[in-house]
Amino acid sequence: MPIPLRIYITPFAERGSVEPGQWSSETAKKALDVVNTIWSKAKIAFVISDCLMEKPLDMAKSARSNDQRLLGVLASRHDPDNAIHIYLVNSIENLSAGGSSYPNSEPEPASFVQWYGNDHANGRAWAHELGHLMSLDHVEIDYSNEKQAAQRVKNLMTKGLSAGSDLTGQQIDAAKGSKLVKRFGG
């Protein structure tokens, strides 16, 4: 059974001046296709249950680069419920991550994903954030160990801005056994 996602397309504003939005329901669907391709290795699928265009979030550009603060502000705009909340936001200057999530879906299953400009990059970042909601941690790379680095750089959960989409057997088992997947019949 696919896991339902409630999508909030959330443009930014600063001092009342609305910035042009980058996400649309169509780009969200295309990115979700990439997400589902990546997670198909674990036989986990996601579906958009709702896709809502949000009122712009009026927040100074300088405040957006703190990923946990931004996630808290986005999540505070909606009461927690039984849905997984995904906030799709414009690209953010000086943000060193593709988005942010509440690890292990605590206090609620919520993530934001910033715009990267193409379906594959958007979907890979989104798949990474869903990994955190399914209890997966970042993969650290020891670049002095070339063999390990060559393998891990391709992993979906590699920390930072990467293009990896691989999952290990251990990651697949952890995701399938996560509270989030079990909640939706996985």
State the predicted function of each range.
Residues 1-39, 44, 55, 91:
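Fold-level signature of zinc-dependent metallopeptidase catalytic domains
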